Amino acid sequence: MSLKNNFVTKFFLAIILIFLDIFSKQLVVRFVELNQFISINFFFDIVYIRNYGISFGLLADLYSAWIFILIGTLITVFIIFIYIQSMDKFEKLGLAFIIIGAISNIIDRIFNGFVIDFISFHYKEFYWPAFNFADIYIS
């Protein structure tokens, strides 16, 4: 595969993953009330949460969308630099997923002022903080 075709393929896959994240969030906004839990089974719920902070809602009290957008963008640019320098294909794959997830969550902050989280796992009364597909990509 030529270098150009390889880039186009990777770029297209990145766009699909970003679209999947954004589309899933918009489905939640359209069909789930804010803070509503929809039980799927004994350990999985769909919930509409607005995350004004960073991971797991941390620093939400210091909320400023533009600060998080700026910091997220700077970190993403730094990770892109590491990606470009890397020669290991598995490291590049992991970094690519982090970059894709970060870009998707930055898009959320730019257009909404917050990140939409909706995937909720729990065991009895212990709930893991809600997250989204972009968070899965980053993890």
Where are the regions that the model predicts?
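Alpha-helical transmembrane bundles and membrane-interface segments of multipass inner-membrane proteins
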Residues: M1-S139
